[in-house]
Amino acid sequence: MGERAKALLVDDRKDNLLALEAILQGLPVTAVAVESGEAALKQLLTDDFAVILLDAHMPNMDGFETASHIKRRERTRHVPILFLTAADRDAQLALRGYAVGAVDYLTKPFDPWVLRAKVSIFVELWGKSQQLKAQAEATRERDAQWERLTETVDEAARVLRAGGEDAATEALALLEKARWGS
């Protein structure tokens, strides 16, 4: 369960990616930086992320198109997307970001401490989600064990009800086998 959370940083400008990596330094998250929407989609095929920081304006596939692809995929639709963009007075762009599934839309320059706080929250939520998944798996395994034990007890009871000279020995063997999980 000790898997470290990852943040996907998507921006066509290397200097912006370096700035984002510096802002996230010290947080319990591994930053994975890519320079295009296409590269982001490719990265999402192999890695799971706690959060995506996505530049809205990029050549070829912009952030809005990238986000819509991310939200259409079953494997990635739950990953929170924070749009980051250059100072923009057009409120319609923020609305467009929310329409394609963003959880937030920040314009540059933004307060790095605010971004750190937002990323920290999503990393914490991701960690809780991982814990819940592990607990759900443990519960499924326990339920399966109980199901097998119940079936064995039922079988032993059938053997005893059927009677016969070896019924008790056979029922006991079934129960012992179940007890040791074989």
PLM regions: where:
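Conserved acidic segment of CheY-like receiver
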Residues: 3-24, 32, 52
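Active-site residues of response regulator receiver
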Residues: 11, 55, 85
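Alpha4 helix (beta4-alpha4-beta5 surface) of REC/receiver domains from two-component response regulators
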Residues: 65, 77, 88-104
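C-terminal output helix
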Residues: 110-119, 123
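Active-site beta3 strand of CheY-like receiver
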Residues: 47-54
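Receiver (REC) domain active-site loop signature in two-component systems and cognate sites
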Residues: 58, 70
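CheY-like receiver
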Residues: 124-165, 170
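Helix N-cap/capping motif at the beta->alpha junctions
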Residues: 33-42, 63
